């Protein structure tokens, strides 16, 4: 596999990035008549949909209880335990045992090979007219195996299943790399796209998908002569290996700083005992939690300075890895005909160019600067002397303590009592019901359907009772589970053609056109659709095991995290396009975080809190006084550190651009000099630059330089847009549960997936009368549009508690 083409630049031609991401509900009580392939198309008995006749009220109550009561969940989840034949993982008919992964991959591989043969042999107009759809199906078949196997090999507790999933992943990934070098596919697609008699019959979606694939082929060196293509392959593999080494090899130049223990006053004495040595000194480590706590709490400024400098200075070996990575990327861009790696990476993003990103970030620095000065001036008054970078965490902590002692409401400590996981899930369902007319319905999992007994299955239904998506919620902590919250698209939405159904029926009586996973018949077109299947993973504490035990109670931060991941989910669920390559979150990298960041605003809006925030034991709603206290607390925290945190993110994005915008013939890269240059030019608390202090090299710890090379600006870009939509579409919370606002956002943004320019989505949501969109300045994007978004700013983001 190492000799095949690896393309770490952007979405590969035959797979799309998994954003780690979505959901919805109805208004009047209705009997759900679940429309699926069960009637018109053959499917195994064990994958038939369960009873959907439960009322909306019962569903709503059940939703809360399946997450809050372990006893209720055990009883609820055992209702299908007697089913004689096990269902495969996530209803996939092949995955009833570890060996099933091999079968699943081989069956999918055979279907892929048949499509490739068809495309390569195409010669008639009719054959060329189906090409975009054929290649989209090829992409779907690859993603079916790669995305699901990649998820299962990480999340499943059984090593045998992990290994089987890894082998299936490797098989299809290697085949994908073979396709990347199959020049005939590129030639045939370009021939189809150049023929007006073909493209005149294509839908807008087919045209978009064709252009995406052509661009991806171009970025995969498919058009190069053999010797250049081999060089491209070698560079891509080098970048992959260097990137992995860079991410995993972060290390400081010094492992610890030696400090006299009596100079560590302020640090937790228990921690001091842990690092204390025999000679009345302590070895303060330069990585991990202890140096962060030292910067926040040690009273001695000289100690803080020493810890700060050491913890932000990378080893020479790590800096060499980074600089080699940047050189290889620049060379790859030059080989591909681009001025720089940033030019190559940004060409299909909303930003389009490094210059536009620079305009955005520069405007953002200016819009944020006044707030930064306000925050730093307050800290400087506390210190009574010029503020240094190693002072910031310390004096922020002091201010937070002062605020907590003087003004923070004691009742805020009780807020998590109103945020049981079940009530929050109930609130999300009710919110989606009001905004989009979709809701979440707990469903009993079939035997073998989930990878752990604690995984809850939710079906998403619309107001007509139609099933539109499946969500697997793996939200509780357990040993060896990855702690980071994430959203995974296990299967994208897509229209399944009648030809596929017929092909499936001819192969095997038990075969299913969506591998047994969820499908439904579109009531308008009467075509079969594969439904989006999503996994949400979090690490919340488990509820009590007895019947009256405490449920999992969430902090405000955890509530916002769950809303964030559900924002990704709602994009997947409502962005149901006919072709999978542009469904849901399969959009430009600098647009993908918009729905999730916007969802965070809803979490603490008073009208949304009224939907769900109730005491887990008494069912008493969160009082208006407590809601006001939470808002004051958030505002206070934001005014203490929010703008400086914004500036830190902006600086990281500027460093990323500085590294990746250098021309390929620029020679060796001094990453530390560039980092220091950005810091001195844009930071309000720049790194020390005096001759007696060696320059810091924090860039060696900036692992996102690999995974988000040239696109690190995306998150703050989407934050600026989300803030704007929150104010101008949802009235800063006044219309947070308003159907008209929800429909506007759904119809202009969510439903398109990646089938519409992000700029068109934003402009459509704001409307032509919006001052920021005067003269249609946003629709076409470009430098001025990026600068306009920068002027919107990021505000201040604080978290209560």
From Swiss-Prot:
The keyword Transit peptide applies. Coiled coil: none annotated. Its cofactor is Zn(2+). The keyword Oxidoreductase does not apply. One of its GO terms (biological process) is peptide metabolic process. Keywords: Hydrolase, Metal-binding, Metalloprotease, Mitochondrion, Protease, Transit peptide, Zinc. GO terms for molecular function: metal ion binding; metalloendopeptidase activity. Cleaves proteins, imported into the mitochondrion, to their mature size. While most mitochondrial precursor proteins are processed to the mature form in one step by mitochondrial processing peptidase (MPP), the sequential cleavage by MIP of an octapeptide after initial processing by MPP is a required step for a subgroup of nuclear-encoded precursor proteins destined for the matrix or the inner membrane. Binds 1 zinc ion. This is Mitochondrial intermediate peptidase. The active site is at residue 565. It catalyses: Release of an N-terminal octapeptide as second stage of processing of some proteins imported into the mitochondrion. The gene is oct1. Its EC number is 3.4.24.59. Residues 1-41 form a transit peptide. Disulfide bonds: none annotated. Transmembrane segments: none annotated. CDD domains: M3A_MIP (cd06457). SUPFAM superfamilies: Metalloproteases ('zincins'), catalytic domain (SSF55486). It is an enzyme of class 3 (hydrolase). PANTHER family: MITOCHONDRIAL INTERMEDIATE PEPTIDASE, PROTEASE M3 THIMET OLIGOPEPTIDASE-RELATED.
């Amino acid at each position: 596999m190492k000799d095949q083409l690896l393309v770490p630049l952007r979405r590969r031609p035959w797979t799309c990035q998994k954003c780690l991401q979505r959901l919805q509900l109805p208004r009047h009580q209705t009997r759900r008549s679940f429309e699926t392939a069960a009637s018109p198309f053959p499917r195994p008995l064990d994958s038939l949909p369960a009873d959907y006749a439960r009322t909306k009220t019962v569903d709503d109550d059940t939703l809360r209880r399946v997450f809050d009561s372990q006893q209720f969940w055990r009883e609820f989840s055992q209702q299908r335990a007697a089913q004689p034949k096990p269902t495969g993982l996530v209803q996939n008919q092949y995955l009833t045992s570890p060996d099933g992964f091999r079968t699943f991959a081989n069956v999918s591989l055979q279907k892929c090979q048949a499509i490739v043969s068809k495309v390569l042999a195409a010669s008639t107009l009719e054959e060329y007219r189906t090409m975009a759809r054929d290649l989209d199906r090829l992409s779907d078949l690859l993603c079916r195996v790669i995305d699901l196997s990649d998820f299962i090999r990480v999340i499943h507790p059984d090593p045998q299943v992990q290994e089987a999933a890894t082998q299936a992943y490797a098989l299809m990934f290697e085949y994908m790399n073979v396709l990347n070098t199959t020049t005939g596919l590129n030639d045939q697609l370009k021939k189809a796209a150049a023929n007006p008699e073909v493209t005149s019959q294509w839908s807008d979606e087919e045209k978009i998908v064709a252009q995406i694939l052509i661009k991806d082929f171009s970025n995969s060196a498919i058009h190069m002569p053999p010797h250049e293509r081999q060089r491209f392959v070698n560079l891509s593999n080098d970048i992959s290996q260097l990137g992995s080494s860079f991410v995993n090899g972060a290390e400081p130049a010094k492992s610890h700083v030696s400090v006299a223990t009596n100079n560590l006053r302020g640090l937790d004495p228990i921690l001091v005992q842990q690092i204390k040595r025999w000679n009345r000194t302590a070895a303060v480590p330069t990585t991990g939690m202890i140096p962060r706590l030292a910067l926040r709490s040690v009273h001695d400024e000289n100690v803080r300075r020493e810890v700060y400098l050491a913890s932000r200075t990378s080893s020479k070996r790590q800096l060499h890895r980074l600089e080699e990575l940047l050189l290889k990327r620049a060379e790859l861009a030059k080989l591909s005909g681009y001025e720089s790696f940033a030019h190559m990476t940004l060409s299909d993003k909303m930003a389009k160019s490094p210059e536009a990103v620079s305009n955005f970030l520069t405007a953002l620095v200016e819009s944020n600067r006044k707030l930064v000065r306000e925050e730093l001036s307050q800290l400087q008054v506390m210190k009574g002397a010029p503020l240094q970078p190693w002072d910031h965490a310390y004096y922020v902590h002091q201010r937070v303590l002062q605020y907590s002692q003087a003004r923070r409401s004691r009742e805020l400590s009780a807020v998590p009592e109103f945020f049981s996981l079940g009530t929050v899930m109930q609130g999300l369902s009710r919110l989606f019901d009001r905004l989009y007319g979709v809701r979440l319905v707990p469903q009993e999992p079939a035997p073998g359907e989930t990878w752990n007994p604690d995984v809850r299955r939710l079906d998403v239904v619309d107001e007509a009772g139609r099933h539109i998506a499946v969500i697997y919620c793996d939200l509780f902590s357990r040993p060896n589970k990855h702690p980071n919250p994430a959203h995974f698209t296990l299967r994208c939405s897509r229209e399944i053609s009648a030809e596929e159904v017929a092909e499936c029926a001819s192969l095997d009586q038990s075969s299913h056109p969506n591998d047994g996973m969820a499908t439904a018949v579109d009531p308008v077109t009467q075509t079969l659709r594969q439904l989006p299947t999503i996994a949400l993973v979090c690490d919340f504490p488990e509820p009590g095991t007895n019947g009256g035990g405490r449920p999992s109670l969430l902090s405000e931060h955890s509530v916002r995290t769950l809303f964030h991941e559900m924002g990704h989910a709602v994009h997947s669920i409502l962005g149901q396009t006919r072709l999978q390559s542009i469904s849901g979150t399969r959009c430009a990298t600098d647009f993908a975080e918009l729905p999730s960041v916007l969802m965070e605003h809803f979490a603490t809006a008073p009208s949304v809190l009224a939907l769900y925030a109730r005491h887990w034991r008494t069912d008493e709603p969160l009082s208006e006084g407590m809601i006001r206290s939470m808002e004051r607390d958030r505002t206070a925290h934001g005014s203490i550190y929010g703008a400086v945190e914004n500036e830190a993110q902006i600086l990281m994005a500027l460093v990323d651009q500085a590294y990746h915008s250098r021309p390929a013939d620029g020679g060796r890269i001094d990453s530390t000099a560039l980092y220091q240059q950005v810091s001195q030019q844009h930071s309000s608390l720049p790194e020390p630059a005096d001759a007696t202090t060696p320059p810091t090299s924090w860039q060696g710890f900036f692992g996102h330089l690999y995974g988000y090379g040239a696109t690190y600006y995306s998150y703050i870009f989407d934050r600026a847009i989300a803030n704007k939509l929150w104010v101008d579409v949802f009235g800063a919370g006044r219309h947070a549960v308003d159907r008209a606002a929800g429909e506007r956002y759904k119809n202009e943004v969510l439903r398109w997936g990646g089938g519409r320019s992000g700029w068109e989505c934003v402009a459509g949501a704001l409307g032509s009368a919006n001052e920021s969109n005067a003269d249609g300045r946003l629709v076409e994007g470009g430098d001025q549009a990026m600068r306009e978004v920068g002027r919107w700013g990021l505000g201040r983001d604080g978290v209560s508690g």
